[in-house]
């Protein structure tokens, strides 16, 4: 009996990002920075969490002195939740946000998002998952219907590269040798962009506000 094997897949790390209530009006600016930093926004929703939902989301902070203020702040108005994807999404998003205390960020990382948009330690504009386990939990919390795929290891990634990346790259290098452009790096980059067989189609998702 012939067994049909599924095609290998490649997965990109994902993280949860929140634009907090007091900077929701800066969403478009912040998203432009996110996209310009190499992230893809996989999912996006605008919602208003109740204090109870905020308590459940920040359950690991329960019992700390700032917990009541945190839940009050996060439930004070609508926020924007996004699933961001790219290579090493969790660490890159944390780096782009900067230190959790916006006052510190303004001193040590003045170009970070929390330095630009945050106010203080509590009102720090943005949230990001701390690690992979937190990312899985937080994405499920904000996007219950999303299926989180495992990160590939070893052979699955190699199979994907051999089947889908290597042929296109080889064709590009062959064309490069024929063309002999003055700037081969720029030419190849441009060729790969134009001939990417997996080039995504731009989808415009409707913006919905939830109570």
From Swiss-Prot:
GO cellular component terms given for this protein: 9+2 motile cilium; extracellular region; radial spoke; sperm flagellum
EC numbers on record: 3.1.-.-
Pfam family, one: NDK
Annotated GO biological process: cilium assembly; CTP biosynthetic process; epithelial cilium movement involved in extracellular fluid movement; establishment of localization in cell; flagellated sperm motility; GTP biosynthetic process; mating; negative regulation of oxidative stress-induced intrinsic apoptotic signaling pathway
Xref: SMART domains: NDK (SM00562)
Region NDK, residue ranges: 13-145
Subcellular location: Cell projection, Cilium; Cytoplasm, Cytoskeleton, Flagellum axoneme
Keyword Hydrolase included in the entry's annotation: yes
PROSITE patterns in the cross-refs: NDPK_LIKE
Main localization category: other
UniProt xrefs under PANTHER family: NUCLEOSIDE DIPHOSPHATE KINASE, NUCLEOSIDE DIPHOSPHATE KINASE HOMOLOG 5
Sequence similarity: Belongs to the NDK family.
Protein name: Nucleoside diphosphate kinase homolog 5
Lineage of source species: Eukaryota, Metazoa, Chordata, Craniata, Vertebrata
Gene: Nme5
């Amino acid at each position: 009996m012939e067994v049909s094997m599924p095609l290998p897949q490649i997965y990109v790390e994902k993280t949860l990002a929140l634009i907090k209530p007091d900077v929701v009006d800066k969403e478009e600016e912040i998203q432009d920075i996110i996209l310009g930093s190499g992230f893809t926004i996989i999912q996006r929703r605008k919602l208003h969490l109740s204090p109870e939902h905020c308590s459940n989301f920040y359950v690991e902070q329960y019992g700390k002195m700032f917990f009541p203020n945190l839940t009050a702040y996060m439930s004070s108005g609508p926020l924007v939740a996004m699933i961001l994807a790219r290579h090493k999404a969790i660490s890159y998003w944390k780096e782009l946000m900067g230190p959790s205390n916006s006052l510190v960020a303004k001193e040590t990382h003045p170009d970070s998002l929390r330095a630009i948009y945050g106010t203080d330690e509590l009102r720090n504009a943005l949230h990001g998952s701390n690690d992979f386990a937190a990312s899985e939990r937080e994405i499920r919390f904000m996007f219950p219907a999303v299926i989180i795929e495992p990160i590939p290891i070893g052979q699955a990634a190699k199979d994907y590269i051999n089947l889908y990346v290597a042929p296109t790259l080889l064709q590009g290098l062959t064309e490069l040798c024929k063309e002999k452009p003055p700037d081969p790096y720029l030419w190849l980059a441009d060729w790969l962009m134009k001939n990417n067989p997996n080039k995504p189609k731009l989808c415009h998702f409707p913006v919905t506000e939830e109570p």
